[in-house]
Amino acid sequence: MKALVDTSLLVRYLTGDPPHLAEKAAQVLDGEETLGITEVALVETAYVLESVYGVPRKEVVDALLALLQKENLRAVGGDKDLWMRALLLCRPSRRVSFGDALIWAAALASGVKRVYTLDARFPEEEIAVGPPEDPGPG
């Protein structure tokens, strides 16, 4: 692998906007070169597509799933299968953020049974979530 891709390249590729940059992005992503993608780029791309471009959640997830299935794209510092599982978790609901879904999937994959969070919307499927228990007075 000679290069990683960043959010701007992914957004141009997925939106086609603006066309001259989308074409450059397509040349890179649709080429033969093996490329790396990070979890940060994935989460940022999801955020930009949803919040800046107004793409519906299901379409964002479907686009990112298709992207992750590209043969020449490798996960750097993560696991593509885990990322896809997280995306599928947040596809049907705006309640679960992409970031929280990735944390949830990482907990499941690593065998961790609890996630400390103060977020009432954190996914609870198959794990315990909530604030740390108060240890009481010193």
Where are these regions (language model features)?
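Acidic, PIN/NYN-like endoribonuclease modules and their adjacent C-terminal/linker elements
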Residues: 104-138
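Active-site neighborhoods of divalent-metal-dependent phosphate/nucleic-acid chemistry enzymes
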Residues: 73-113
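Short, well-structured N-terminal submotif of metal-dependent ribonuclease cores
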Residues: 1-37, 53-62, 120, 134-138
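Alpha-helix capping/helix-boundary segments
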Residues: 9, 41-42, 82, 102-103, ...
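Short, conserved active-site loops that position catalytic residues or coordinate cofactors/metal ions
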Residues: 39-47
